[in-house]
Amino acid sequence: MSVLQVLHIPDERLRKVAKPVEEVNAEIQRIVDDMFETMYAEEGIGLAATQVDIHQRIIVIDVSENRDERLVLINPELLEKSGETGIEEGCLSIPEQRALVPRAEKVKIRALDRNGNPFELEADGLLAICIQHEMDHLVGKLFIDYLSPLKQQRIRQKVEKLDRLNARA
């Protein structure tokens, strides 16, 4: 397993729409393992393949405190959503920035697991929010897209400054 490089805004590769996975095979399972390794190394709770420049419909999530409840979503589809909620969201592709984003309180999805088996999942709370956030990535959407143009610009400037400082270090 290896840690992959996470793309940061304003990288346009984050805006690419991911393609469906045609076959869950050893290569896809390796990508899933690398994505978990990357997510844990970056201290995230979710990661979409597009964030690591792999433009396939793959998401990994672990919202558990002990980091031992791995969820793999391959080719996820939103079946239902209900209610309204929102929390301050962050994103590994938008480091050190957070903003309140409106989300559905509950979701029902269909996806394939890491072995290619189909399943359905009903989620609420943080898991539902994380699923929606990561599914947005698969269609090239970021949490800042829900914000005003002024807030988007401020966040972009902060991230670009942070990346410049990190490049010098």
Curated annotation (Swiss-Prot):
Free-text cofactor note: Binds 1 Fe(2+) ion.
Entry annotation: catalytic residues: 134
Function: Removes the formyl group from the N-terminal Met of newly synthesized proteins. Requires at least a dipeptide for an efficient rate of reaction. N-terminal L-methionine is a prerequisite for activity but the enzyme has broad specificity at other positions.
Gene name of the record: def
NCBIfam families listed in its UniProt record: pept_deformyl, PRK00150.1-3
The EC number(s) this enzyme carries: 3.5.1.88
Superkingdom as given in the UniProt entry: Bacteria
Keywords annotated in UniProt: Hydrolase, Iron, Metal-binding, Protein biosynthesis
Signal peptide boundaries: none
InterPro entries: Peptide_deformylase, Peptide_deformylase_sf
Stored SUPFAM superfamilies: Peptide deformylase
Catalytic activity: N-terminal N-formyl-L-methionyl-[peptide] + H2O = N-terminal L-methionyl-[peptide] + formate
Designated name of the protein: Peptide deformylase
Stated family: Belongs to the polypeptide deformylase family.
Organism per entry: Salmonella typhi
GO molecular function: metal ion binding; peptide deformylase activity
Required cofactor names: Fe(2+)
GO BP term, pick one: co-translational protein modification
Residues that, per the record, bind Fe cation: 91, 133, 137
